[in-house]
Every structure is written in structure tokens, then in C-alpha cells.
From Swiss-Prot:
Family of the protein in this entry: Belongs to the TALE/BELL homeobox family.
UniProt cross-references to SMART domains, sorted A to Z: HOX, POX
Region (Disordered): 302-333
Compositionally biased region (Polar residues): 313-322
Subunit-structure text: May form heterodimeric complexes with TALE/KNOX proteins. Interacts with OFP1.
DNA-binding region, residue intervals: 228-290
KW DNA-binding (keyword) present: yes
Protein name (database record): BEL1-like homeodomain protein 5
Chain intervals for the UniProt region annotation (SR/KY domain): 80-96
GO molecular function, one term: DNA-binding transcription factor activity, RNA polymerase II-specific
Length: 431
């Protein structure tokens, strides 16, 4: 137990409690005290009596010993663990170390509590840019923490309200929680306003604009999004992907039914008319060009295949020189006969027997040369015609074809050899 007389304050440590008493230094101290005070001082100072303040010594600062009486009695604190902390507290409050036992001096304002931008602009201490940036980052994180804590308290209040309403009914908790919500919001709003004010002052020192404008600029630089008021052009990408997948799945018949349109509208979040309009445009812009491209590719493949077949047939025909020579000779002899027959038929064609005799004479001349005649595709594309019309190949009327009903023109698989097989037992040569 210890008692300290320090200027106007008397601190008593009784067990673990501290009692502060204000004393008047100009008032004479009475020697008579109550029984409780006598017992307390006897416990503190043994057989010593309570003496006036003029006998009280001084505190030797920096030492652990405290002089209490003029007769040299030295009292050491029973609890030296708390002595240093108590001295620091007293030095901070009444400034004992400087010897000023008078009135309390105002506590100096710390640098952390000052608002940057008020004193610094007047010519005071101006911190560095790095320190300001660090403080600004701390303040921003503090503001985010305040917002998170406010959300947490608000969620807790909502859970309390919901549980109370389950027991007492809807709207029964409004009268009890309205005031609490208002006070919480006011407190958090005040803290947030102070943080934003500090950030604005730091921004002024840094030579930047307002905090809100800076955030807008950073947002514009980071994200190049279109304005929210501008309407979106076209359909959403997800809806277009769903419609395009359905179109390619039903590529052969891209005409959805009403049920398909309703299903696609539910999947994409569009209306039925929007789905139908999209398919109309897609068939014109996507499906039709693809079909034309596929058709052109198939035609190119067929042409290349025909060209390869022609090259192969030319190679096979070059291996048969005998047939080539006969074909050349036959072509040289066919043309005069063909011209002769055509000139004869330029006269009135009433005498069909004369025209037929020309043809039979031509065939009789060349029957002995070979069993078949290769025309090299000369008459391959000419076909017989029905009725009594005139043939364009030989210029003969079709009435004479009745006498040659057993003449067969056969073409090989490659279309290169044409043979005329005649049976002499079924027809008669007309002179």
C-alpha cells in the first residue's frame, strides 16, 4: 500500500484500486482524521503519524525511491511494476517533470489527428509524396472496412428483425429497431465523411482534383464500356449462340416450327417474333451462302474427276495405234461422203431410197476395213429423234430408220469408242 502526494492530487493505491483526491494547498491540514483514515495511514506508514504537506518531500524523477518524510524515512513502492506507468501518466497529465504543478496544459495535437491541407498549406510541415500516398491508401482501406462493418451490422439487425417478426408478426419490430438503425447509420456516416474529408485534403496536397473525379477518370481509363443509356444493338451473344447452334443442327431444313420457336424463346429469353426474324435473316445471310459454296465445291470436284477420266482415256487410246490410224482414215473418208449425202438431201427429200442408198454405200465401203469404226466422239452427241422429223446428224428423214431397225450404236464405258454393228441377215440393200 502506498500514498503519493503530488501537487494537487493524492493517489492512493488500496489493493488494486486507485483513488484520486483533489487537495487545497492553502488550507491547513487537520491532524484529526476519522478512524478509517487512521487505519489506512497506519497500514501505509507503520508507526508514523499523518503530517502536514510541508513535511512531504519530493519525487526524485528517474529513481525508483520516493522521499516521503523529512526525518529520512525512505519508502519504496511495493509495486514497482506500475510505478513507471503511473509516472508517465502523471507527466502526461500534469507535467510533473517540468516542475509545473499549476493548471493543466492543453495536450498537443498529434500529427495523425490533423487534417492535411489546412495547416500544411499555410506554410507548415509538408510531408513527402510517398507518405501522403501511403496515408491515402490506408484511408481508402479504412473506408472500405467501415462499409463492410456497416453491412455486417445491418445484416445482423435484419436477422433480429426477421426472427422477431416470426414470433410477433410482420411489422412488429419496426418500432423497436427504427431508432437503432438510424443511430448506426448516423455514426457510420460520420466516420465515412471524416475519412472522405481526409482523402480530399491529401488530394489537394498532391495537386490532384477531387476524389470522385479521379475515380471517374480511372474508371474510364480502365474500362472502355459504352454508356448505360445507349441501347444495345442486336441480340445478346448467348442468345445468338443458341440460335446458331440450332441452325447448324438442322442445316438441311432450317425452318423451325412454332414449338421450336417457343422453346428457343424460353432458352434465349427472347420473344417468338424475335426468334422468327433472326431465322429469316440467318437463312439469307448465313445459310444460303453456305449452300452455294458447298454446291460450287461439289461442281469443282466433279469437273476435276471428269478431267482425270479424260486424261486416263487419252493414255489408253495412245496404246492402240491401229485403232487411231483407222479412225483417222475413216474420218477422212466420212466427211466427203457426209457432204455428198447432205448435198443429195438438199434436193427434195421425197425419194428417201436414194438417201438411204448413199448411207449404205458408205457403210459397204468401210465394212471390210474393220469390224467397228471409232469416230473419236464425232457423232457421240447426236441422238435419234422420234417421229418423221429430220435428223441433224446426217440430214435424213426418220422414215428410213425403219429399214435400219437393227443398227445399234453402242458407246463404251468411257465414251470414247462408238461401234456400229450391222446384221446383214435382217435388212436388204436398196439400189
Amino acid at each position: 500500500m502506498a500514498a503519493f502526494f503530488l501537487g494537487e492530487s493524492e493517489m492512493r493505491e488500496h489493493s488494486s484500486d486507485l483513488f484520486m483526491m483533489t487537495l487545497n494547498p492553502f488550507r491547513e491540514q487537520t491532524t484529526t482524521t476519522n478512524a478509517h483514515d487512521d487505519h489506512f495511514y497506519n497500514l501505509c506508514f507503520g508507526s508514523q503519524q499523518y503530517r502536514p504537506r510541508d513535511e512531504v518531500g519530493h519525487i526524485e524523477q528517474g529513481n525508483s525511491s520516493i522521499s516521503t518524510f523529512s526525518n529520512g524515512g525512505v519508502f519504496r513502492a511495493l509495486a514497482p511494476i506500475y510505478l513507471k506507468a503511473a509516472q508517465e501518466l502523471l507527466n502526461e497529465i500534469v507535467n510533473v517533470g517540468n516542475g509545473s504543478h499549476g493548471a493543466k496544459q492543453e495536450r498537443p495535437v498529434s500529427k495523425e489527428s490533423t487534417i492535411y491541407g489546412v495547416e500544411d498549406i499555410n506554410g507548415g510541415y509538408k510531408p513527402g509524396v510517398a507518405a501522403l500516398q501511403m496515408k491515402k491508401a490506408k484511408l481508402i482501406s479504412m473506408g472500405e472496412m467501415v462499409e463492410q462493418r456497416y453491412k455486417q451490422y445491418h445484416d445482423q439487425m435484419q436477422t433480429i428483425i426477421s426472427s422477431f417478426e416470426q414470433a410477433a408478426g410482420l411489422g412488429s419490430a419496426n418500432s423497436y429497431t427504427h431508432m437503432a438503425l438510424q443511430t448506426i447509420s448516423k455514426q457510420f456516416r460520420a466516420v465515412k465523411d471524416m475519412i472522405s474529408l481526409q482523402i480530399k485534403q491529401i488530394n489537394k496536397l498532391l495537386g490532384q482534383k477531387e476524389f470522385d473525379e479521379q475515380l471517374k477518370k480511372l474508371g474510364k481509363m480502365a474500362h472502355h464500356h459504352s454508356n448505360a443509356w445507349r441501347p444495345q444493338r442486336g441480340l445478346p451473344e448467348k442468345a445468338v449462340s443458341v440460335l446458331r447452334s440450332w441452325l447448324f443442327e438442322h442445316f438441311l431444313h432450317p425452318y423451325p416450327r412454332d414449338l421450336d420457336k417457343v422453346m428457343l424463346a424460353k432458352q434465349t429469353g427472347l420473344t417468338k417474333s424475335q426468334v422468327s426474324n433472326w431465322f429469316i435473316n440467318a437463312r439469307v445471310r448465313m445459310w444460303k451462302p453456305l449452300v452455294e459454296e458447298l454446291y460450287s465445291e461439289e461442281m469443282d470436284i466433279e469437273e476435276s474427276r471428269k478431267g482425270s477420266d479424260r486424261y486416263s482415256t487419252k493414255g489408253s487410246s495412245s496404246k492402240q495405234p491401229y485403232n487411231n490410224t483407222t479412225s483417222n482414215e475413216s474420218s477422212n473418208t466420212i466427211l466427203p461422203a457426209f457432204r455428198q449425202g447432205f448435198t443429195e438431201t438438199e434436193t427434195p427429200r421425197q425419194n428417201s431410197s436414194s438417201s438411204c442408198s448413199v448411207v449404205m454405200r458408205f457403210t459397204k465401203q468401210h465394212m471390210n476395213q474393220a469390224n467397228f469404226i471409232n469416230f473419236n466422239g464425232g457423232f457421240e452427241n447426236y441422238h435419234t429423234m422420234d417421229g418423221n422429223s429430220v435428223s441433224l446428224s446426217l440430214g435424213l428423214p426418220h422414215s428410213c430408220d425403219q429399214t435400219f431397225n437393227n443398227i445399234h450404236f453402242e458407246s463404251t464405258s468411257h465414251g470414247t469408242e462408238n461401234s456400229a454393228i450391222y446384221s446383214s441377215s435382217t435388212y436388204q440393200i436398196m439400189d
